[in-house]
Amino acid sequence: MTEPTGDQTPEIIGVRRGMFGAKGSGDTSGYGRLVRPVALPGGSPRPYGGYFDEVVDRLAEAVGDDAFTESIERVVIHRDELTLEVHRDRLVEVAQALRDDPALRFELCLGVSGVHYPDDTGRELHAAYPLMSITHNRRIRLEVAVPDDDPHIPSLFGVYPTVDWHERETYDFFGIIFDGHPSLTRIEMPDDWVGHPQRKDYPLGGIPVEYHGAEIPPPDQRRAYN
């Protein structure tokens, strides 16, 4: 069995300046001059290494070669992890095959993670699903990217019911709408909260918090590096 291979040349989608990417903050921390490219892992060539080739080949057999080509936008091996970047219209079909095929048997979805890449034009919002096969002791990840102006992804609740609260949290914090979810409401923020707090375009601010009788001002009103 070969070791997993590395990814190809990373895809540079932007440049981040300063420690937190903030501008005009009066930061005197010494990190204001940092310049760092924002990079996403590139697609990986064959052989992928480990059990990754077997998983990809079996998935292609399970859904059909034509459907596989239409479903999988890119195969990425990064940090010894297999990520299948899936077109959103095919997400449910791919997840069903990964769960039900005896040679795959990814019975468990460990959650949903949202990510916001403002510089990834047309693909600003990402949802990642780590999957685990208890039968075969394997792990992979599915990832779907959608644009800011059309943040819809089919819900995987019908395939993996355990994503119920995870999809609600991702909707709450990132604004990704999971079509078909039985009750897609906020789960941590108040129902009338404006915006989605973990997006990178969410303004720094907040509401005062009482703690042991003292009132702590929101972040934008605290003294910081000024």
Curated annotation (Swiss-Prot):
Its Gene Ontology cellular component terms are: plasma membrane
Membrane topology according to the record: Peripheral membrane protein
> What are the boundaries of the region Disordered?
1-21
Q: Note the SUPFAM superfamilies from the entry.
A: Nqo5-like
State the reactions this protein catalyses.
Answer: a quinone + NADH + 5 H(+)(in) = a quinol + NAD(+) + 4 H(+)(out)
A GO molecular function term, named singly, is: NADH:ubiquinone reductase (non-electrogenic) activity
Q: Where are the transmembrane segments?
A: none
Q: Which UniProt keywords apply?
A: Cell membrane, Membrane, NAD, Quinone, Translocase, Transport
Q: Which domain of life is it from?
A: Bacteria
Q: Does the keyword Ion transport apply?
A: no
Give the UniProt subcellular location, in the record's own words: Cell membrane
Q: What is its main location?
A: membrane
Q: What is its EC number?
A: 7.1.1.-
Q: Does the keyword Calcium apply?
A: no
Q: Which family does it belong to?
A: Belongs to the complex I 30 kDa subunit family.
Q: What does this protein do?
A: NDH-1 shuttles electrons from NADH, via FMN and iron-sulfur (Fe-S) centers, to quinones in the respiratory chain. The immediate electron acceptor for the enzyme in this species is believed to be a menaquinone. Couples the redox reaction to proton translocation (for every two electrons transferred, four hydrogen ions are translocated across the cytoplasmic membrane), and thus conserves the redox energy in a proton gradient.
Subunit structure of this chain's protein: NDH-1 is composed of 14 different subunits. Subunits NuoB, C, D, E, F, and G constitute the peripheral sector of the complex.
PANTHER family the record matches:
NADH DEHYDROGENASE [UBIQUINONE] IRON-SULFUR PROTEIN 3, MITOCHONDRIAL (PTHR10884:SF14), NADH DEHYDROGENASE UBIQUINONE IRON-SULFUR PROTEIN 3 (PTHR10884)
UniProt protein name: NADH-quinone oxidoreductase subunit C
**Which species is the source of this protein?**
Mycolicibacterium gilvum (strain PYR-GCK)
What gene name is listed for this protein? Answer: nuoC
